[in-house]
């Protein structure tokens, strides 16, 4: 399988990209230094996409009039990854918890129209503090793109539930945390 595989690596940082090219370019890896948003990629051709999507409340200049064209950067990356993924392919990404916990389920609904959630893990608080100097709460999400006409799996991950925040009370009133229903049904996937 490895001999028949083609790997494309996209790295925004020039120094990291040059290191990547130096290490793997001779092995046939197509290393592209630049942003994923500027990369020319054939749609429906990749079997597996791995990404640590950028976190932020800014968008991408995308004039292609796609359902995610005006989405935040992390949601845009997920939408674009699904475009270049072939049916049956997997996308595995680390993103902020806002993708699964956002009160507006519009982007999740768009994703669910094309792909099924295979699994997700809520990573422990502070996972990236030491190595990336960020305290953002993150999820590891795996999606599988469906073939045209393939029935969708149940999509409980479109909805949110309110669960009590342990140890947090305001007077006599319990406070609640809004969390994706998938994690309420799969608490063993909440690692922190």
Feature roles, as predicted:
Residues 2, 43, 72, 133-136:
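A generic fold-level signal
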Residues 129-192:
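Flexible, glycine-/basic-rich loop-and-beta segments that form/coincide
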Residues 58-63, 103-104:
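Conserved ATPase-coupling elements of RecA-like P-loop NTPase cores
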Residues 10-19, 69-129, 136-143:
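Conserved Class I SAM-dependent methyltransferase catalytic core
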Residues 3, 25, 113-114, 134:
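Short, structurally constrained coil/turn elements
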Residues 65-67:
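Extracellular loop and loop/strand-boundary signature of outer-membrane beta-barrel proteins
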């Amino acid at each position: 399988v490895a001999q028949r595989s083609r790997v494309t690596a996209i790295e925004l940082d020039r120094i990291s990209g040059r290191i990547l090219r130096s290490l793997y370019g001779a092995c046939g890896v197509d290393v592209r230094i630049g942003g994923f948003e500027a990369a020319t990629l054939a749609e429906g051709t990749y079997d597996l996409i791995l990404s640590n999507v950028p976190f932020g409340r800014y968008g991408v200049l995308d004039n292609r009039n796609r359902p995610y064209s005006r989405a935040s950067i992390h949601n845009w990356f997920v939408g674009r990854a699904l475009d270049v993924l072939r049916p049956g392919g997997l996308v595995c990404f680390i993103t902020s918890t806002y993708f699964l916990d956002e009160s507006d389920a519009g982007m999740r609904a768009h994703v669910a129209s094309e792909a099924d959630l295979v699994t997700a893990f809520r990573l422990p608080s502070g996972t990236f503090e030491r190595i990336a100097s960020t305290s953002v709460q993150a999820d590891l999400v795996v999606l599988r793109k469906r073939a045209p006409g393939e029935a969708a799996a149940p999509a409980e991950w479109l909805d949110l539930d309110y669960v009590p925040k342990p140890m947090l009370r305001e007077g006599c009133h319990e406070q609640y945390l809004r969390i994706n229903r998938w994690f309420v049904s799969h608490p063993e996937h909440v690692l922190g």
